[in-house]
Amino acid sequence: MAKDLLLEIGLEEMPAHVVTPSRIQLEEKVIKFLDEHHLDYETVQSFATPRRLAVKVTAIPEKQADVEEEVKGPAKKIALDAEGNWSKAAQGFVRGQGVTTEDIVFKELNGVEYVYVTKFTKGQSAKEVLTKLNDVITSLTFPVTMHWANYDFEYIRPIHWIVALLDDEVIPFKVLDVTTGQTSRGHRFLGDDVTFQHANEYEAKLKEQFVVVQPNERKQMIVDQANALAAEKNWQLALDEELLEEVTNLVEYPTAFVGSFDEKYLSVPDEVLVTSMKEHQRYFDVRNDQGLLMPHFIAVRNGDNVHLENVIKGNEKVLIARLEDAEFFYNEDKKLTIEACVEKLKNVTFHEKIGSIYEKMQRVALIAQIIGRKVGLSEDELEDLKRASEIYKFDLVTNMVGEFPELQGIMGEKYALLQGEKPAVATAIREHYLPTSSEGELPETAIGAVLALADKLDSVFSFFSVGMIPTGSNDPYALRRQTYGVIRIIEDKGWTFPLVQLQTEVDEAVNQDVEKYGVLLNEGQAEVVEFVKARLRQLLMTKNVRHDIIDAVVSAEQADLSKLFASANILKSRFEDQDFKPSMEALTRVINLAKKGQELLGDTEEGIDPSLFENKAEKELYQAVNDLSEAFATRTIAENYEALVNLRPLIDAYFNETMVMVEDEKVKQNRLKQLMQIAKMALSIASLDLLIVK
């Protein structure tokens, strides 16, 4: 008869951000354990609260299935000695499999005979196998750990109880000094201990003790209660998903309530109030039907509604203390001047090897002007960009950003406007941080986008120049994220962006005055290009671009990011075209022969000699390629792709009538030069020879 398994690990309160990953990890490890131990099952469901991680598995058989498997051993020539006796290798092999040499048979594999034995393993009872679940519990990993009592063992929090049931039977094992049983604990303040008579009682019995073990159920309770409170007051409520997830993992039995604060605090910017409520207190802000912030909030307690008025007062009191600080910081910051803040940045270190934040701003101002001119900003825009880049980090030394680092840029915009800066300048100060995540909001304005590019590229160029290149998962300065942001901005704006040329210009400009800019940019150019292309590969994968197209694009003799995007898009969109396969095959043949020409001739500057042509196909292809090359540099990737595809009939005719690798050295070299000319244009789109066409 099939039985249900219940495993619960009882802990002291875990940090909210650890709860969901740990629940998923436990579920995955239990599934792996069952699979490895040949125990079938129907469903696996995981549960978690701040005080527990649990898994319930249905329909586990009473015992493992008997297993009969064929095991391969050493080769016959190793298994037998010169006299035909079993060698030590053979004897050791059968002993390890629990059989004897009489069970050996020989079978041929790839022309070689090997020893094989059939190994029979009788299935153990499920209960006996499941006693090894202690290994699953101790194998869980966490971002931070602690040890307690006199144990060397480390875990996210001390383990206080373990429930392990197979239907109604306790599965006996220990973790440290904690022995498994059938008793769990209810809510820390509202519930009692609860004893399960059967594994399937888990959710219902704990709910009686004010513990909702299913995270999605707790989350829905919070959503329903919060929406009901907002509807009752005619408020607008947009539940922040990240905060909702956190609050769900802070409570075992959620009860939502409304709190209030004095309207005078509404004079402080909304972002400050919302951040105070969200980041410090885990409250949800509410707005009226015009979208204006209200002097109220919705919060969630870990418990029922008994004495809720005391809970509300306590939460309001704590929030008011936060808002008093915020109001004070805001009023003090308004007394500061931008120039005074910028001056302070001279004494704020960006990195000991790269200089101060002030020096970084000096570099970014220079880089921003180079980029701004390349992407076609107007003179007025360049002037606004100049001002923004001279002051854009000033808010880092304000009281408000010191208290709420997540408001950097946001407060910079607000303070800049208060001090009479142009809106375009203020907006750029806020937008230069964007995007803040792989899918985050991008800068909307051209000035903000250029400043964001300059700031991020300065970080990449500077850290690479002093040898601080991310390795493995180690990226303390978020250079991968910043580079990914650069690529996303370029894609969004569609700007021409020749990275190598830009980096060379920046290096030359910065290196003219190292004392002013704080760093010498003379290393890491090639590494930067490869680093950027690796992030491009990552972005293209998220867009479901074929792996061979990604390989072809990233390997291209091209470092203009906008053109690489265009190449990926055109190849992805045309991959199913009827003429794609023959066109790519023709161009690949050209590229492969051109590589031989490269080996033979190097980067020759000598031109093609039409007088050496021997047939009509050579002449027609030569004329068509010359016509194409005249406009190739000024046309779009899509236009150049179409032009190259249109060469296919001429290329086919060329190969039908022309032998390239002939004995006449002059003719051979002339033909290779002709193919190298075509290949150079093709490879500027992508390494088309890497495409897999069927």
Swiss-Prot record:
GO molecular function, one term: glycine-tRNA ligase activity
Top EC group: ligase
PROSITE patterns: AA_TRNA_LIGASE_II_GLYAB
Domain of life from the UniProt record: Bacteria
Catalytic activity of the protein: tRNA(Gly) + glycine + ATP = glycyl-tRNA(Gly) + AMP + diphosphate
Gene Ontology biological process terms from the UniProt entry: arginyl-tRNA aminoacylation; glycyl-tRNA aminoacylation
Keyword Nucleotide-binding in annotation: yes
Compartments where found: Cytoplasm
Pfam families: DALR_1, tRNA_synt_2f
Keywords in alphabetical order: Aminoacyl-tRNA synthetase, ATP-binding, Cytoplasm, Ligase, Nucleotide-binding, Protein biosynthesis
Listed GO CC annotations: cytosol
UniProt EC number: 6.1.1.14
Subunit: Tetramer of two alpha and two beta subunits.
UniProt record similarity statement: Belongs to the class-II aminoacyl-tRNA synthetase family.
Protein name: Glycine--tRNA ligase beta subunit
Organism of origin: Enterococcus faecalis (strain ATCC 700802 / V583)
